[in-house]
Amino acid sequence: MKNIHMKTRFSIFVMLALTCQILVAQTHIKVNDSNTWTTDELAPYVNQEVIFDVPIIVSSNASSPYTVSTRRLFTPTNQAAPNTTAIKTVTSLNSKGAMQLSGLNKELRCGDKIYNLKARVNSTTSLTYLDGPCTNSRAYYDTVNVRRLVNIADCDTCLLVCTSNLENYFMGNNYHSRQRAKVINALKHIDADLLGFVELECGDAAIKEIVSYLNSNLPHRTYTYISDNTTASGTDTKAAFVYDKNVLKTYGDMMVITGGAGKARKAMQIFEQKRNGERFIYSVNHFKAKSGTGTGADADQHDGQGQFNATRCQEAQAVIDLYKRLVGQREDKDILIMGDLNAYAKEDPIRKFLEYGLIDLHRSFHADTSYSYQYGGLAGYLDHAICSPTMYKQVCGVIGFHVNSDENDRYTYDKSSDQTMFRYSDHDPVLVGLRLDGSAATYDPKPEINNLEIIRGNASHLVIRDAESTDEQISYYAIYDISGRPVVSATKIESNMESVNLPDASGVYILYVYYKAKVYPYKFIVP
């Protein structure tokens, strides 16, 4: 056996494959890949007790029974482009991978893993809990129900940018004091240098209140906001900017895009970092929702993108057009586009940004695993962080802070007197760390690895060595075929000797390892 030698600190080499199993009395059901396992395999065990020795993951916790699976279930258009074979595969695997688990008298968050689950199989899609499981966490959760925020801007020169959908923050809300307490507790915990909001009441009253409470709760901050001269009107909401004026200053006036949904839901502002004079464009947006009844091109095309997709595409183009105009005027290409775009990662509006040459930071840093929103037991990200190639070189991290989407909605301000930050909105805030002097630890979107060497022999899987995840940086691997179709979706690297089963079908494949904010591709052949 011979190692692949890389310039990085981890290596990939070939070993014999292992399999996961479900234990049923003395009978084993082999689960070679949790990402493709289907509930059809439970058919022989209906009315029997089983013990799962693969972790079972909670996909929906809105009510009992919980929806669970051997994998995290994602919205199809978050993982694959509309009208493709790949999206049909994701849709099929979602429907065949979900089970209903009843009888579990324990509050779990979406994404929680249940180890050693003992259950009665009522049908191929229905289980009844029989024995106490041991839960363990994905990000921001552990066995004592603590959600942690990873610091992605941990240097003196870094900026932390946070964009959040505030889920209709209105001064006249009957539960406003509860909502305000939850929002302020969350923003206080995040402690960002620059904040962008959507679903905030038009006018100055709501944004002024948030700034006042933040300054009272964070004495080291001196936040201020940008007035847009709007007035409160019914249910109208806007995009808004809040920044620490000791850290940043505005350069020029705020620019509002009035087309599409709402009059003030898309805005751009150039900011300058005071310590070094570096500038960048910050774009905060709230695109047209998928709900409602569209007509013509805005009608539901039944491709997974919902209503008003054409309008969202027009909104994306309007953002690009304003950016192009600013580049022509200011000669600065650095832009960070954020907000609730009401489009998942592979949908047409996001494709417009990528085809223009911009970069999806969620995808770059976290492969296929990012999410900011849950709907119908499926995760995905409507809340984006997209940037130009010049900005990309200055990004030192991006995360969705899962303080909302994974939570049971009984914590919402209108259903509970709870005033913690948990479930302050239905969307997770998205955080981006920036180092505007250009020295951020980022990577080329298409890097090359030299000095690779491998002897395959008859081996049936790869091993990724020394790239295990840490609390500060989660590592993943994914496998794609030569046409770009995902074969193994992004999987967290849990150990320093991570086993990766090779695909069954012959062909050429690409293994991507996402490690320490870099991505490393490795091409291999299954004979």
Model-inferred region functions:
Residues 31-33, 44-47, 52, 110-117, ...:
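Metal-dependent phosphoester-hydrolase catalytic domains
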Residues 275-278, 284-309:
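Active-site His/acidic residue clusters
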Residues 200, 206-288:
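Structured beta-strand-rich core segments of catalytic domains in phosphoester-bond hydrolases
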Residues 445-527:
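C-terminal outer-membrane/trafficking sorting elements
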Residues 1-27:
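Bacterial Sec-dependent N-terminal signal peptides
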Residues 167, 201, 288, 341-344:
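Catalytic metal-binding/acid-base residues of hydrolase active sites
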